[in-house]
UniProtKB/Swiss-Prot annotation:
Record's catalysed reaction(s): (S)-2,3,4,5-tetrahydrodipicolinate + NAD(+) + H2O = (2S,4S)-4-hydroxy-2,3,4,5-tetrahydrodipicolinate + NADH + H(+); (S)-2,3,4,5-tetrahydrodipicolinate + NADP(+) + H2O = (2S,4S)-4-hydroxy-2,3,4,5-tetrahydrodipicolinate + NADPH + H(+)
Broadest EC class assigned to this enzyme: oxidoreductase
Protein's cellular compartments: Cytoplasm
Pathway(s) it belongs to: Amino-acid biosynthesis; L-lysine biosynthesis via DAP pathway; (S)-tetrahydrodipicolinate from L-aspartate: step 4/4
Organism: Anaeromyxobacter dehalogenans (strain 2CP-C)
GO molecular function per UniProt: 4-hydroxy-tetrahydrodipicolinate reductase; NAD binding; NADP binding; oxidoreductase activity, acting on CH or CH2 groups, NAD or NADP as acceptor
Enzyme Commission number: 1.17.1.8
Gene3D superfamilies xrefs: Dihydrodipicolinate Reductase, domain 2, NAD(P)-binding Rossmann-like Domain
UniProt name for this protein: 4-hydroxy-tetrahydrodipicolinate reductase
NCBIfam families: dapB
Active-site residues from the entry: H155 (proton donor/acceptor), K159 (proton donor)
Function: Catalyzes the conversion of 4-hydroxy-tetrahydrodipicolinate (HTPA) to tetrahydrodipicolinate.
Domain of life of the native organism: Bacteria
Cross-referenced SUPFAM superfamilies: Glyceraldehyde-3-phosphate dehydrogenase-like, C-terminal domain, NAD(P)-binding Rossmann-fold domains
Amino acid sequence: MTKVVVTGAAGRMGTQIVRLVRATPGLSVSGAVERAGSPAIGKDAGTLAGGEPLGVAVVDDLAKALPGADVVIDFTSHEASVRHAQACAAAGVALVIGSTGFTPDAKAKVAEAARKVPVVLSPNMSVGVNVVFELVRQAARVLGDAYDVEVVEIHHKHKRDAPSGTAVRLGEVAAEALGRAPADALAYSRHGILGERPPWQIGIQTLRGGDVVGEHTVFFCGEGERVEITHRATSREQFARGAARAAAWLPGKAPGVYDMADVLGLRGGK
């Protein structure tokens, strides 16, 4: 039985993950963590998730939940995820990160922790989205430079980071498939008189509103035709399901940074 610690256990994603982990054969919830001062501290993680008690009380420090654990599932913030990665590295516990908004410095700190333990770091745990990454890669290779690439994403009004990590990754996948450096190709906003669109540019546009769980569309715009690849999330459950799948796959792997393509076997694993 793989023992799983869930951070942000009282949040929207955390409660979904607790429910999915307890329902997944071979996985069990061994710990639950919330921020210091949260009213969830001391409460049962199973009850908070709307189910039967698990006998697992929510604590305010990840280090308290790590003894005996096999893997941590973390959907918090990139700042908290860095601290959690460092704690997991010190304790020798594998880590699945679904947080977004990572800066290059934060990613570097996670990579440093991954020198000691295996880490799955993915901007989107959905199986469908990770299939879309591969579809975009293939489309970009086939369509080539004759098609302009644009990415549009929309999320609920409460999402704090923009653009989404998934949108950025979609742009990166297209850029890499076209032989372009993402740092040079990706354009995150347009305003004013900019002149003609540079042919090497990949635009990423952000919309926020209502209760939209998440929607991403990649446009390949050519002369006389347009190809669109879209993923629409209608529930957070598919993110939790992917995270549980990653948690079952990760323990026992060599230290390093993995992503959902590795988990799903979409390319040769490490």
